[in-house]
């Protein structure tokens, strides 16, 4: 029998002949307190390897130890915990509960509930929902969803708007979102109670109908009720902070907060400085839009070689004011004046913008059902129930079956029952309220147990033939909003090197006309449209080409003369090329390759 290697934190430290006994002995020592409870040990018999981990940073979770088919945690322990005679640490010290990492959990046989324990089980879940993290733990009835949907929701929860910090009014975060009327979810989980999610909720309870609406909610688009939005549904504020400091430079020069004078290099128009106070800083509650100056600032010149007509060095200051970002607007929310570590003056301006949901804003339920707003409909045109209930949101029925997010269907049923009974429903995965109890609550309040109702067309007033599934679901507004993403450009800055438009919304860049778009125009035979996009509207350049040698010729502006650097006296002709092509020729020359352009008469 080959010896089993033992690794500690990935380093080989020795071997042993009886691996099963060794691992069992180490676990006993850990449970009795002889070895640190933070140690985890795993045996891989097929590889003849034992791994021991003690390093920090491992994700570990608590489980109840099971021995001989019986959990070590008894009713007596639970009573002592309730009275305070025992604490959590006492349970660990007594070897009743232990923490396992991912490696050791690989070889553990964990029971979900005490009823299913047999002689082979090694551990028992404290509660089945504890296997989920914080983000996945807020999903009600998560055990009824497919795992990719739960994974998606765990990611999107972090993007949901809510009360991100209770002291948001005292902070100057670079960017921040704040939901105006966050609500606690009607359908909750035990992890929501444990984590204090109710203190900082990040969503609202929507009345949701599952039906199509004129095709405007196909492909996960959502239909929103305009009246609900006007009442404040999913309304939020966006905060952006700007800052500037009076930096000091070698030679005693420094930046200054002031309203720049007209002689300053880079001076803007007077209207751009209209909101500034005498000290060069904007007043609170001023309404600003992109390009408006928030902090008027001038800086010393970069170079001191400029000599005026009297022979002295001229100090012509530069305009370096802080302006509102391109494409943004808002109201100055707060102005903070303080000092940097070096003792220079520091100004911070926070601008707020109120945002009502609009077409293209992203929403998601707690079951990975994400979608963007496809249409905002007046309340009088929305469908309504026999009781006069108008849904806040309409989602497409196609979003449910293939994704198997049955948890959302159950949440809508539970939310409806909770609203009628004036209580919150426990939707904890595996151990929440039973589906039959929820259906019974609906029946007791005069509703169909399947959650369907007869709806009437808001436009014609006729009863819709199909019965519509309608209920209450918790929806989250995510920070992906149209206002931050919509962009168009007709003219703007170009790059110095390639003379092509810059890239990106923040830099007022162009929209890339890529290879695939080019191929489409080629396939259509739209030659002039292709030339317009890729040449005329991009980086058109008139290059002079020598007729004899095919080299790029030079134009001497002072002597008003065109000449070839090689042939000198030969004739040269203007040729329209892309500047990127001219740049390529220059780079080939730097590699000692002689590119020649052969000229022909224009047809």
Swiss-Prot record:
Principal localisation: cytoplasm
Which CDD domains does the UniProt entry name for this protein? RNA_pol_B_RPB2
Which co-factor is required? Zn(2+)
Q: Which reaction does it catalyse?
A: RNA(n) + a ribonucleoside 5'-triphosphate = RNA(n+1) + diphosphate
Q: Where in the cell is it found?
A: Cytoplasm
Q: How is the cofactor bound?
A: Binds 1 Zn(2+) per subunit.
InterPro entries, alphabetically? Answer: DNA-dir_RNA_pol_su2, DNA-dir_RNAP_su2_dom, DNA-dir_RNAP_su2_hyb_sf, RNA_pol_bsu_CS, RNA_pol_Rpb2_4, RNA_pol_Rpb2_5, RNA_pol_Rpb2_7, RNA_pol_RPB2_OB-fold
Q: Which UniProt keywords apply?
A: Cytoplasm, DNA-binding, DNA-directed RNA polymerase, Metal-binding, Nucleotidyltransferase, Transcription, Transferase, Zinc
Q: Which GO terms describe its biological process?
A: DNA-templated transcription
Molecular function in Gene Ontology? DNA binding; DNA-directed RNA polymerase activity; ribonucleoside binding; zinc ion binding
* Cellular compartments per GO CC: cytoplasm; DNA-directed RNA polymerase complex
PROSITE patterns linked = RNA_POL_BETA
One Pfam family assigned to this protein is RNA_pol_Rpb2_4
Residues given in the record as Zn(2+) binding sites: 546, 549, 564, 567
| E.C. number(s) listed in UniProt | 2.7.7.6
* PANTHER family xref list: DNA-DIRECTED RNA POLYMERASE I SUBUNIT 2
Role = DNA-dependent RNA polymerase (RNAP) catalyzes the transcription of DNA into RNA using the four ribonucleoside triphosphates as substrates. The Rpo2 subunit (Rpo2N and Rpo2C in this organism) is implicated in DNA promoter recognition and in nucleotide binding.
The family line of this record is:
Belongs to the RNA polymerase beta chain family.
Subunit details for this protein? Part of the RNA polymerase complex.
Kindly provide the name given to this protein in its UniProt entry: DNA-directed RNA polymerase subunit Rpo2C
**Source organism (scientific name):** Methanothermobacter thermautotrophicus (strain ATCC 29096 / DSM 1053 / JCM 10044 / NBRC 100330 / Delta H)
Name of the gene encoding the protein in the UniProt record: rpo2C
